[in-house]
């Protein structure tokens, strides 16, 4: 469970407590009725919406960051090509020690920027992995809570 996302997970224990309190009632013989069903389904829908909205926001954020990284890579590649073309034109297409040093500096700068992008992508991969676990855990919670609800038993 990702601690920072805790409030976005299904409130399984809260839903289960609510089920138990509605089933037992004051006299311990209360039958599950339409009011109980309606209230439980409303709470279940609220939980589902909470989880869904969080997932959608995280997915949008991940895609946005991927797009930004893709754009950065495209710009780096274009800048590298442009800079090398300009260097070769300025030096009259001659390859010399000075030109090689400038190429090495340019390559080092580009390599450093690529490493930054790689680090960003590693974080995104971890976020995708965490989101996958989040989805699986919530799915399991929804399946379990609907199986133990009286409406599932009565059906």
Question: What are the language-model segments listed below?
Answer:
Residues 1-155:
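Activation on extended, non-transmembrane soluble regions of large proteins
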């Amino acid at each position: 469970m990702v601690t920072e996302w805790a409030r976005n997970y299904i409130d399984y224990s809260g839903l289960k407590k609510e089920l138990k309190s509605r089933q037992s009632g004051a006299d311990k013989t209360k039958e599950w009725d339409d009011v109980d069903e309606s209230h439980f389904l409303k709470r279940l829908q609220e939980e589902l919406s909470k989880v869904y909205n969080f997932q959608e926001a995280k997915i949008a954020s991940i895609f946005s960051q991927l797009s930004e990284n893709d754009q950065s890579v495209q710009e780096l590649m274009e800048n590298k090509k442009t800079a090398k073309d300009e260097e070769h034109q300025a030096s009259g297409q001659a390859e010399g020690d000075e030109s090689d040093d400038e190429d090495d500096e340019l390559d080092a700068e580009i390599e450093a920027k690529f490493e930054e992008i790689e680090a960003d992508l590693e974080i995104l991969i971890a976020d995708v992995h965490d989101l996958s676990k989040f989805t699986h855990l919530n799915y399991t919670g929804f399946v379990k809570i609907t199986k133990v609800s009286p409406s599932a038993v009565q059906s």
